[in-house]
């Protein structure tokens, strides 16, 4: 599939999702220069990455799972990126904690692009109001994230996300995983999980 990537004129960042893997399995990637890693759970990430980030400040750790408000203060200590901002309550908590600790993560607004009740994320029709609310809270919103429905073709959802990112002038787009990354790249994904 690397040959497929050569057909595309951009180089999206690949987030190696390292959840459940111990550092001795991850170190070979770090030794070869990979710097973007994703975790789903705050506690696991804090235990795994806190010390190594002190030694290797170039590492960028991404929260790719849901974030509960009671975990925000811990999350800000280790995560450089949060891909799952999906509520005003969470936005307020991140704003409060980043002001206290003088840490400002880069944040993706999670869009429930398939309008699925079992998934997090804000509805498409809420994006403008929610984005403006986040800006008032001094959050560093850099783009959007989505997980398209598994049972459907991802292209139509990625196309919609690409439209939204252009409309709001977002520079970054977090979408695409191992099963649909080529389609995501075609619709301007800048981060792949």
Residue ranges and their predicted role:
Residues 1-172, 177-179, 187:
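Conserved alpha/beta-domain cores
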Residues 190-192:
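Divalent-metal-activated hydrolytic enzyme cores
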């Amino acid at each position: 599939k690397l040959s497929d990537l050569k057909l595309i004129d951009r180089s999206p960042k690949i987030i190696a999702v390292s959840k459940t893997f111990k550092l001795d399995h991850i170190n070979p990637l770090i030794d070869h220069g990979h710097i973007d890693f994703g975790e789903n759970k705050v506690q696991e990430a804090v235990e795994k990455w806190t010390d190594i980030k002190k030694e290797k400040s170039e590492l960028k750790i991404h929260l790719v799972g849901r974030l509960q408000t009671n975990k925000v203060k811990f999350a800000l200590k280790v995560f450089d990126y949060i891909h799952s901002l999906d509520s005003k309550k969470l936005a307020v908590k991140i704003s409060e904690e980043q002001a206290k600790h003088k840490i400002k993560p880069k944040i993706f607004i999670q869009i429930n692009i398939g309008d699925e009740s079992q998934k997090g994320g804000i509805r498409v029709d809420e994006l403008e109001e929610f984005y403006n609310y986040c800006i008032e809270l001094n959050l560093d919103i850099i783009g959007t994230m989505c997980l398209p429905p598994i049972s459907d073709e991802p292209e139509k959802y990625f196309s919609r996300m690409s439209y939204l990112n252009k409309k709001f002038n977002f520079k970054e787009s977090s979408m695409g995983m191992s099963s649909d990354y080529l389609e995501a790249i075609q619709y301007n994904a800048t981060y792949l999980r």
